[in-house]
Amino acid sequence: MSGSSSLPVVSQESHLVEILCALSDHHVDFVVAGGVAMVLHGVERTTLDLDVAVSLEPDNARRFLEAMTNLRLAPRAPVPAEIILDQESITALVREKNALVFTFWSAQEPYRQIDLFLTRENSFDDLVADAYLLPIRGRVIRVASRGKLIEMKSRVRPVRAKDISDIRALTELEKKERDNEGRTRD
């Protein structure tokens, strides 16, 4: 890799780490999923946005909104951020607008984006049970398990080439891990 091609990765990493640390510092209960989780599992791919499942318990959702304010991230859609505090409004977004995520971003730095999952299948409660813990800059964050990521990628419609590629990569990693475990027991 040449020096110039690695520069965006540094920028990408720093804004993602900044967001993860802010969520942790605000004591937000969340699980990282999507492309960032893929990278954290060892899959080589590029991603700029951060996909998260956040517990939408009222106090936790308020801490999440406070973190978004401190990060200067605002809703991408022309609706108030506080909509995530109301479960009926979330249900209406999913039902009426077919919304899968609620996006917060910076209009000045559009690569600084976080997608909050809205659907039950990608909820915090669904992903947290077998999430693994990862230390980042003195904090511990939860990352969706490979199995959950495979399930999530398998449900995407329409099927996208990157999701098929991600499923293959995760399956290969799981196979290598099983093979290595088998060798260490022998």
Model-derived segments and their meaning:
Residues 1-186:
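Compositionally biased terminal segments of proteins
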